[in-house]
Amino acid sequence: MRKAINRPDDLALFGAPPLFAEPLHVGRPNTGNRDRLLARINAVLDSRRLTNNGPMVKAFEKALADYLGVRHCVAVCNGTLALEIAIRALNLTGEVIVPSFTFIATAHALQWQQITPVFADIDPLTCNLSPASVESMITPRTSGILGVHVWGRPCAVGALQEIADRRGLKLMFDAAHALGCSHRGRMVGNFGECEILSFHATKFFHTFEGGAIVTNNGELAEKLRLARNFGFRGADNVVCIGTNGKMNEVCAAMGLTGLESIADTISLNRANYERYAARISDVPGLLLMRHDTAERTNYQYVVMQVQEEFGLERDTLLEILHAENVLARRYFYPGCHAMEPYRSLFPDARLSLPHTIALSERVLSFPTGTAVGKKEIDAIGRLLSFVARHSARIRAHRGKRAAEKCSSS
């Protein structure tokens, strides 16, 4: 880490050395206790049982179900496949209402199965699906609602369930961000027909690659187990269409190891979040995403909205941060509706998504987890404070540099 930034010329954007010698990513994979992980992997290798619903997968499913307080956990090879299998098991067809403000996999999992994702707007306060927008999007072709717990903050579960019940729709949730979070005292995983989890290596809890569907519906769980294994019930009896969605034993070993230290990981995330909050408390125009302190949350993401009072546009700040090796990210930009194939299929979708568009142009997610410590967060806080205080000088300096570059070319 280099010396403090005192003037625009000290910014790496204008040619100075970066604040951090090595890039700081939004997250860094947690491996838990390495000795315990390697012991589990060695046990897998010694058993010669590498996949096909082995003992490590069964133990992981039970441990995760116990942690969440759900009856059934069906582990699969990734979160996207979990979405696809659940969508098929619920017999969704026609149209399903989803937010555009989500990772593209949520929409792709529907479109891949010839189901039309209908993009509803978000509530600007929660950043989750707006129940009023959902209600306005329902048509005779609508078969379900797919909510997303963005950044670990649960959707308006009760309102969405009321709409689903009243209109005869299936309700499921993409809980990829929300492992370890609660809503009204119940752990996420207990809502809707089922909830989907992602254990990709970028998540604070991971299985290298992996995912799961959790549900309290035994009949649905059986359909899911059949679907992840080609539809086999027994050695030679295929009873339904299926795919190869099985989690392997090594991934499950990582999951079991990660669960043992999940409380410590969340504690670290919370400490980082609170330190960011303290360091930017007097920075104008930066709005830190808040959590309901009465509920459990995983503090997986440190998300800020860059507002007009900051003095620079979000993307200009992003350029400054990246030049300093602070690899903040835009979550979610530009929204699913503005990506292919949806941009071409639904060119007018943007007209009904004003809050989605506004938020996607303001949000940044900052490095946290084991990627940063106290010194790094303090330095990022000082950088943000400097940029906000000197935003006018930075804009002028940037314009001057651009003019000089044009005149010399």
Task: Explain the meaning of each model-derived region.
Residues 49-95, 101, 109-112, 119-121, ...:
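Phosphate-binding glycine-rich loop
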Residues 128-135, 185-194, 384-385:
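A short alpha/beta connector and helix-capping loop motif
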Residues 190-226, 249-252:
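Active-site PLP attachment segment
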Residues 23, 55-63, 67-73, 132, ...:
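PLP-dependent aminotransferase class I/II
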Residues 173-207, 234-239:
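Conserved active-site segment immediately N-terminal to the catalytic lysine
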Residues 74, 97, 118, 171-172, ...:
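Structural detector of well-ordered beta-strand residues that form the stable sheet scaffold
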